[in-house]
A protein has these predicted regions:
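Secondary-structure capping and domain/repeat boundary segments
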Residues: 1-228, 233-240
Length: 240
């Protein structure tokens, strides 16, 4: 308010957080610029400030699910967008985690906007076989990164050599099949039984048992017994 034709002191440009002042206008539609005159006009006038949105920073924070089920915040990622506009940052992909759906947020003028993405752990199917194309020892879904213990296996006559491929300490990021590998054991005892024919009564009588050793799965040839000069009588008496 001032007297007609008095000097006008141009005011400082107004300030609005997140915006840049772009001049005065005569109309609300901001189509006709207005220049503040040097002298007070003879009537009141309403003028309108034009504002242009500025780039303002915002953050994306990723929360990865821990093996204990608790989500842990990662280091924030900084972005920028125009004040009061909507932004939809694309969530990053992390191996072993489900990628969340995109979220839309409005960029606040004060720079406090935070877009939060939560990443649950994926589950993968693991199968343990006794041998190639053999019996299934275990088959189940396991959460990525959790502690992994292979099942105990036993195979008579064989020594366990490990799993193929090697079983990691934690669940891998993918379905896997692990096969037990074996080595045939040495020194496995077996018996050779020798029977002699009963000439009078017919049939055979066990004469001797020899205990020998070999390797599991190998074919063995038992040594022949030396009974060529012996004739067995009914009551077990020997005659030459």
């Amino acid at each position: 308010m001032g007297k007609y034709n008095s000097d006008i002191e141009k005011p400082e440009d107004p300030v609005r957080t997140g915006y840049r002042f772009a001049g005065w206008y005569e109309d609300e539609e901001l189509t006709t610029p207005y220049t503040i005159p040097a002298k007070m006009p003879n009537k009141e006038r309403m003028v309108y400030a034009k504002w242009e949105a500025e780039d303002v920073g915002y953050q994306v924070v990723e929360y990865l699910e821990g093996t204990n089920g608790v989500y842990e915040a990662q280091d924030p990622i900084s972005y920028s967008g125009l004040t009061d506009t909507e932004v939809t940052p694309k969530p990053a992909e992390h191996e072993g985690y489900e990628t969340p759906k995109e979220k839309t947020e409005t960029v606040r003028a004060d720079g406090t906007t935070v877009v939060k993405y939560y990443y649950p752990r994926k589950e993968y199917h693991l199968t343990f076989l006794m041998e190639e194309n053999g019996e299934t020892v275990a088959s189940d879904d396991y959460r990525y990164g959790t502690f992994l213990t292979a099942p105990a296996v036993y195979r008579p006559g064989y020594e366990f050599q490990g799993w193929s491929p090697e079983v990691p300490e934690s669940v891998p990021a993918g379905d896997m099949t692990y096969t037990a590998t074996w080595k045939a054991s040495d020194g496995i005892p077996y018996a050779v039984r020798y029977y002699v024919e009963e000439p009078e009564e017919g049939g055979y009588t066990l004469s001797e048992i020899k205990t020998m050793t070999g390797t599991t799965g190998e074919t063995v040839t038992a040594p022949e017994g030396d009974y060529s000069s012996v004739i067995y009588h009914r009551k077990g008496e020997l005659a030459s």
